[in-house]
Every structure is written in C-alpha cells, then in structure tokens.
C-alpha cells in the first residue's frame, strides 16, 4: 500500500514538474518566436531557465520515463501545430541519452545530472534542424505560420552551416550555467532529496 501511495505521489510530482517545464518552454517560445535573435537563442534560454525544474524532476521522482516524456513533449506540440515533423527524431534520442546519464548516477549524482541536462536540452533542436537540412521547406512553413518575410530573411542571413554547432555549444554552456545557479538556489532542497 505504501509503495502504491509513493508511486502515485511520484506520478503527480512528475506531472507537475513536466507541466512546469512545458510552460517554461511555451512562454520562452512565445516571446522568442517573432524576434529572429531570440528565436535562435531559444534552445539556450530554455536550457538556462528550465534547469531548476529538470534537476527537481530528477531529485523528486528518479524517473526515467519522466525524463523521456519531458524531452518529447515540445516536439509533439511542434508536430501538432503544423511544423515540419522531424522534431521527435532529435527529441527522442536526446531524452534517452539524458535518461541513461542520470540513471548512471542513480539520479542523485549532481555532476551526472548536470551532464544529463546538457543532452536533454538538445531536445529542441528537432525544431531548428530544418533550417539547415530542409531550408526552403522550413521558411515556407514559417511564412504559412504567419511570420513575415523580413523574419525569414534575417534568420536565413544569420544561419550559415557553422551556426548549428555554435548553437549546440551555446546550449551546453547555458545548460551548465542553469545547473550552477540551480545548485546555488535549490541547494537545501537538493540535499534533502539526497542529490550529491
């Protein structure tokens, strides 16, 4: 009975934290989307501001399933709203890699959880990859989605092929910064959850 109650409590906690992550993603996305520079910074901004939620998700639930669900959710939204449907092809591997890294530290090793978050934060790149691999189709879908030609022209000009690795490295860096501040801000909560 106790195990069942604990399992139910973990499921509720995971649901709340996944929802909080999704809201963080959605709010940053809504603010970023019309502005080219913010649009390209979006994976980095989400990595930074969602870090506390991610670390609490690991600490409170120790759930592999929760990590994968959180990773995939934004890509499902992208596909559901008519974006080019390759987003899950990046989100799923990112979630699985993040899950194995966190699991390797039994979800309580803060260093491994930090590395896990770095790879987890690549989950959004499925929405950006078409800028390079399906360039014309991407800009057509953006126009159909209601953004203007000037947005497309600016993003096109700012995204030579070398910008992709720059964005990935930037996301890793912002993820590290987010994890650093998480440890500073939520230190007591993480300690009480047994995260070292």
Walk through the language-model features, giving the residues of each.
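Short, charged juxtamembrane terminal tails flanking transmembrane helices
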Residues: 1-3, 8, 186-196
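Hydrophobic alpha-helical transmembrane segments
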Residues: 11-16, 44-45, 64-72, 85-89, ...
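Membrane-interfacial segments
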Residues: 28-36, 61, 65, 85, ...
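Interfacial aromatic-anchored transmembrane helix boundaries in multi-pass membrane proteins
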Residues: 30-34, 38, 74-102
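Short helix-perturbing small/polar motifs within transmembrane alpha-helices
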Residues: 23, 91-129, 179
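Membrane-embedded alpha-helical hairpins and interfacial helices in multi-pass inner-membrane proteins
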Residues: 39, 114-187
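Aromatic-anchored segments of alpha-helical transmembrane domains
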Residues: 18-26, 73-81, 120-129
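Hydrophobic transmembrane alpha-helices
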Residues: 2-65, 69
């Amino acid at each position: 009975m106790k195990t069942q109650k604990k399992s139910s409590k973990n499921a509720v906690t995971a649901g709340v934290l996944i929802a909080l992550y999704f809201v963080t993603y959605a709010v940053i996305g809504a603010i970023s989307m019309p502005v080219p520079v913010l649009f390209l910074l979006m994976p980095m901004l989400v990595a930074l501001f969602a870090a506390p939620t991610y670390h609490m998700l690991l600490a409170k639930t120790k759930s592999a399933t929760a990590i994968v669900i959180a990773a995939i959710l934004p890509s499902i939204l992208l596909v559901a709203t008519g974006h080019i449907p390759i987003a899950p092809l990046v989100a799923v591997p990112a979630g699985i890699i993040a899950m194995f890294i966190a699991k390797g530290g039994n979800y309580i090793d803060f260093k491994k959880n930090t590395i896990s978050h770095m790879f987890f934060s690549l989950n959004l790149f499925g929405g950006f990859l078409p800028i390079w691999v399906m360039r014309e189709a991407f800009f057509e879908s953006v126009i159909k989605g209601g953004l203007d030609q000037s947005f497309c022209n600016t993003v096109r000009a700012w995204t030579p092929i070398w910008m992709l690795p720059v964005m990935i490295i930037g996301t890793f860096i912002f993820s590290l910064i987010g994890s650093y501040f998480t440890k500073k801000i939520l230190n007591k909560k993480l300690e009480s959850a047994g995260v070292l």
